[in-house]
Amino acid sequence: MYKTALFYDDHQEKRKKIILVILLLLLLFGIYKNGLQYLSNNLVLKTDIFKLFLYPIISFIGVLGYSLLKKEKITIDNACEAIILALLVPPRFPLIIYSIIIFGYFLLKSFNYKCIEAISLIVIYKVILILVGSIIHLNNLNLVELNHSYHYGILNNFFGYSVGDLGTTNIVLIIILLITMCSSFYYKKELVFYLLLPFFIWQVINVLLLKELNTTLLQSTYFFASILIAPLNGKSPGSKKEIIIFGLGISLL
């Protein structure tokens, strides 16, 4: 069974619960940011908001089906996985295609291929979402952002009011998540540092030369992926040299 490195330690149940709560907050904020906040102004329909709730419901159904197939109990690990899958989906992604991708995700997971585990199944999942989005010409704008022009400032970006996936825009919550996970022995903190280092360097250059922060970088799902995918994958680089090469290489790409 595929597990992330963070969840290998059975003595970290309390930390798992904290992480689960933060992931839930990211999800709830994403639903608010992409739908609920516009309801009072009649900019979205209730059916549009209901659709946002269907993403985590579909991913939890996938977890349930996988657990029944493997005859395993549903754990906090499974709940976290289901929420992460929902957080990474663009807010207007077609539900039918999303359901097919979730089915494929857990089908691949059931085979337990070592090559897939080494790459990280969640990485494959996100790449497929990006590829499908490109094919059907879908971006990360929600329904209101698609029809109105918005300019998001620095504070908007930090507190999540920016363009992004369903639940990956709130940098404040993501930083809290990072601090929580850094207390785990298995969490690869150095890898996160080298994944984010080029971004911080680029921001310093922007401030020194252009006298402003590059808010486009703050809108990226990259922050969320940098702390939750590679650092938690047990098969990702472990040695100092490998971590530096992998972290800087991926971030530059």
Protein language model regions, located:
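Structural signature of hydrophobic alpha-helical transmembrane segments
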Residues: N41-I57, P91-I100, N157-I171, K211-F223
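N-terminal signal-anchor module of multipass membrane proteins
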Residues: M1-L64
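Central hydrophobic cores of alpha-helical transmembrane segments in multi-pass inner-membrane proteins
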Residues: K51-S67, A82-I83, I101-S110
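Transmembrane alpha-helix boundary signature
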Residues: I31-S40, L64-K73, P90-I97, C115-I119, ...
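Long hydrophobic alpha-helical segments that form multi-pass transmembrane helix bundles
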Residues: Y113-L178
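Small-residue-rich segments of transmembrane alpha-helices in multi-pass membrane proteins
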Residues: L24, A79-P91, I122-H137, L197-V207, ...
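Cytoplasmic-side transmembrane-helix entry/capping segments in multi-pass membrane proteins
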Residues: E72-E81, I97-I100, I116-V127, K189-P198, ...
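C-terminal transmembrane helix-loop-helix hairpin of multi-pass membrane proteins
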Residues: Y8-V21, F158-G167, Y194, W202-L253
